[in-house]
């Protein structure tokens, strides 16, 4: 619970400040809202007497709530990174495919920072955060979500128009 009391306001603050400078699309902003909602649900919804949604077993062995949250969340982070990078490019110019790859790398860097933060918290407070295997699976699903969105962005890239540029 303490993890949420610290992390949620920090993440909201980061998104608000970034949005002020970048001007994220409504889709990305709603993606952040949905990501935080499913993240909170995973940590707060009880499943039986000694589990929460995050660590409850699933019908599909490798697919758990936490991993789906990581895949979808870092897909959103990739889209946000894409929009941040595009905000620095000249209006009317096509966006190189490599920018989608760079956006995925930015999202994966964020995922690594979050895993470091989770590790540091476990040094001081008992949490439901798993051990090294959980961290590894989190990073794998971060990669899957970031890669899926990066591939979609690379395939559907459009030139940045002057209206989108003026929001920054």
Task: Give residue ranges: language-model regions.
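Membrane-embedded alpha-helical segments that form the functional core of polytopic membrane enzymes
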Residues: 96-110
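Central hydrophobic cores of alpha-helical transmembrane segments in multi-pass inner-membrane proteins
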Residues: 6-16
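Membrane-interface helix-boundary motifs at transmembrane edges
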Residues: 15-30, 89-97
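Membrane-interface loop-to-helix entry segments
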Residues: 2-5, 61-83, 136-144
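Cytoplasmic-side transmembrane-helix entry/capping segments in multi-pass membrane proteins
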Residues: 2-6, 23-37
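Alpha-helical transmembrane segments of multi-pass membrane proteins
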Residues: 15, 32-42, 78-82, 106-118, ...
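Interfacial helix-loop-helix junctions of multi-pass membrane proteins
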Residues: 49-53, 65, 111-147
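Membrane-interfacial alpha-helical segments at the cytosolic side of multi-pass membrane proteins
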Residues: 72-89, 123-127, 143-157
């Amino acid at each position: 619970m303490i993890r949420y009391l610290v992390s949620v306001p920090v993440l909201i603050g980061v998104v608000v400040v970034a949005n002020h400078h970048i001007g994220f699309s409504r889709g990305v902003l709603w993606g952040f809202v949905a990501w935080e909602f499913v993240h909170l649900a995973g940590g707060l919804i009880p499943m039986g007497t000694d589990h929460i949604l995050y660590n409850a077993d699933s019908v599909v062995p490798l697919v758990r709530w936490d991993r789906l949250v990581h895949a979808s969340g870092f897909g959103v982070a990739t889209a946000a990174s894409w929009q941040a990078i595009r905000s620095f490019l000249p209006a009317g110019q096509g966006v190189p495919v490599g920018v989608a790859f760079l956006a995925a790398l930015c999202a994966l860097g964020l995922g690594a920072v979050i895993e470091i933060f989770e590790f540091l918290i476990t040094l001081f407070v008992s949490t439901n955060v798993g051990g090294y295997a959980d961290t590894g699976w989190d990073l794998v699903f971060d990669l899957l979500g970031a890669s899926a969105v990066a591939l979609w962005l690379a395939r559907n890239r459009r030139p940045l128009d002057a209206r989108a540029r003026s929001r920054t």
